[in-house]
Amino acid sequence: MEKTKEKAERILLEPYKYLLQLPGKQVRTKLSQAFNHWLKVPEDKLQIIIEVTEMLHNASLLIDDIEDSSKLRRGFPVAHSIYGVPSVINSANYVYFLGLEKVLTLDHPDAVKLFTRQLLELHQGQGLDIYWRDTYTCPTEEEYKAMVLQKTGGLFGLAVGLMQLFSDYKEDLKPLLDTLGLFFQIRDDYANLHSKEYSENKSFCEDLTEGKFSFPTIHAIWSRPESTQVQNILRQRTENIDIKKYCVQYLEDVGSFEYTRYTLRELEAKAYKQIEACGGNPSLVALVKHLSKMFTEENE
C-alpha cells in the first residue's frame, strides 16, 4: 500500500518538481530572511514559513504559465508543454493544499486565516489581470498598481504576516511591503520588454505576445490617447520579432521606459526611507540595491 501511495505522490508532484529544478532567483526566500533581521522568528518556524511561501509561489507559476499561454519559463519549456494542462493544474492545486497542511503545523490560531486571506488576494489580482488582457481593457496606472498589490503583495504579505505571528516586533510593515511589491512587479515589467537578460531567458518580449497590459505599455497607451498602435499590437498576440521590436522602439520614443525607470527610482528611494524608519536593515537594503542594478547600470 505504501509503495502505491508513494508512486501516486511522485506522479502528482512531477510537474511541480520539474519547475523546482529550473534555476530561480529565490527572491522570496531572501526577502523573508532579510525581514527576520527585525522579526527574529525562531528558526524552525521560519523554515516552515519559507517553505510554504516557495510552494505557493511555484504552484502559482505553473498556473500562470497556463493562463498566459507561455512557452518558456526561465529559458526552459513550461511544465504544461511537457506534462499537459490537466496534470499541471492538478499538481499546482495539490501543492496549494500541501501548503495549507504545512501552515497547520505552525499551530497558531491565526495562521490559516492569514493564509486564506492572502490566497484570496492573489486570485483577485490574477483575475483582474486576466480580465483586462482578455477583454482588451487598458487599466489606469492606479488600477494597475492596486492589482499588483493584490497579486505580488499576496505572497509577500503571507510570508511576513505569518512571521509576525511568531514575533514580538509589532511595527506595521504593510507600507514597506506595498512599496516592495510594486517595485518587484514594475521591475519585472521593465525587464520583460527592455533587458538583455530577460530576452535570453524568456522568449523575446513575452508580455507583448501574451497581450498583457504592463507598466510601460499602460503609460504609452494613456500618454498617447490619439494612437492605438500599442493596443493593436497587444491584441494580435504576435510572435513576430519585427513587430515586437517596433513596439519596444515606440515605447522608447514616447518616453515609457524613461517613465518606468523614474517610477522605479522613486520606489527604490521610498523603500530605503521606510526601511530606515523601521530601524534600518542592511540585508534588505542590499537586496533592493542588487535588484536596482538592472535599471540603473544599463543607462549610465
Curated annotation (Swiss-Prot):
Binding note for cofactor: Binds 2 Mg(2+) ions per subunit.
Residues noted as binding dimethylallyl diphosphate in the record, renumbered to the chain: R73, K151, T152, Q185, K202, K212
Residue sites binding Mg(2+) 2 per the record: D64, D68
Magnesium in keyword set: yes
CDD domains, sorted: Trans_IPPS_HT
Subunit architecture: Homohexamer; trimer of homodimers.
Name of the molecule in the record: Geranylgeranyl pyrophosphate synthase
Encoding gene (name): Ggps1
